[in-house]
């Protein structure tokens, strides 16, 4: 093992990272400092985490509140790009990794650590995301990934490892779901979900109401958008984190934001995930409604390309890269006119933009009307159609001439 004196571990208080603390001490002979990122996963997840870390053998535990920064500097910029991975996934886990890695590096610098560690498995995307961020922010620090080194390969073996060392752990050996939560979403993987023929039961979902059990009466919300950012809900000005929290509560009550997908992982395999993103689903619907009004056809096409590019780079862990800065700058320029108000209808799992307006709207009722108008000469369409269809006309004529 390399000569490591002090390592900062991205610690959650779960089974894996509880076992990693003593494993690092035993195998590297180093001091272990636990770092916990509060990205809005909830008080229940954070309760007693410092005591757990020290009981596992950590010399210190730093709990860093990142909730506001996460939503303001990571969620909101991503929303401006319209990024949705493979057309469905709103990237909740991927969005949180850069800020967690950044804060972990900051703690490492603060305590004088010479290494970083995480509890990501060797099969998943997160190992790549974390370590790509480490490489960009702290190339001088060694990275230790226990799941790629140790021989512990199951929940049972991890529990046994902790029991042998008299380290308390509340986890059980029962096969349960792997979950990841933050202010934006919660993900569910594993268990019977690994069979894509198995429909998720209600015990899977923890954040949203069942659409069937949601209120029988729809609820309407008015969202205010300024330059691609949601700044108010029902005319009440709120911070980004507050906007998301309010929308999470309301949308979750109506069963909005559930998706069940099989996605292509960065490491080459497919995986199935169930995601709950209630407030984020409402936010995305509102911003898309504004884009419909203010972006011309070519700009919307360009925005679609940017959205796909940003979704891929974010999913792949390329936040701290020139590519991210370039795509973000392009998306930001398209948001210059993305301001207005959207009324959304929430009802039994669905969210629909039913009213929208913008001072920069390119929609003109005078031009679009099916009734009589004085601004559009329909005869002008004939010349346009002849030019637009000219390539098809030439090809057809040549085909006729060749017999």
Curated annotation (Swiss-Prot):
Homotetramer. It comes from Idiomarina loihiensis (strain ATCC BAA-735 / DSM 15497 / L2-TR). InterPro entries: Arginosuc_syn_C, Arginosuc_syn_N, Arginosuc_synth, Arginosuc_synth_CS, Arginosuc_synth_type_1_subfam, AS_cat/multimer_dom_body, Rossmann-like_a/b/a_fold. It is found in: Cytoplasm. L-aspartate binds at residues 121, 125-126. ATP binds at residues 10-18, 37, 119. The lineage of its organism: Bacteria, Pseudomonadati, Pseudomonadota, Gammaproteobacteria, Alteromonadales. The gene is argG. Pathway: Amino-acid biosynthesis; L-arginine biosynthesis; L-arginine from L-ornithine and carbamoyl phosphate: step 2/3. Its EC number is 6.3.4.5. Belongs to the argininosuccinate synthase family. Type 1 subfamily. GO terms for molecular function: argininosuccinate synthase activity; ATP binding. The keyword Cytoplasm applies. One of its GO terms (cellular component) is cytoplasm. GO terms for biological process: argininosuccinate metabolic process; L-arginine biosynthetic process; urea cycle. This is Argininosuccinate synthase. Gene3D superfamilies: Argininosuccinate synthetase, chain A, domain 2, HUPs, Single helix bin. L-citrulline binds at residues 89, 125, 129, 178, 187, 263, 275. Keywords: Amino-acid biosynthesis, Arginine biosynthesis, ATP-binding, Cytoplasm, Ligase, Nucleotide-binding.
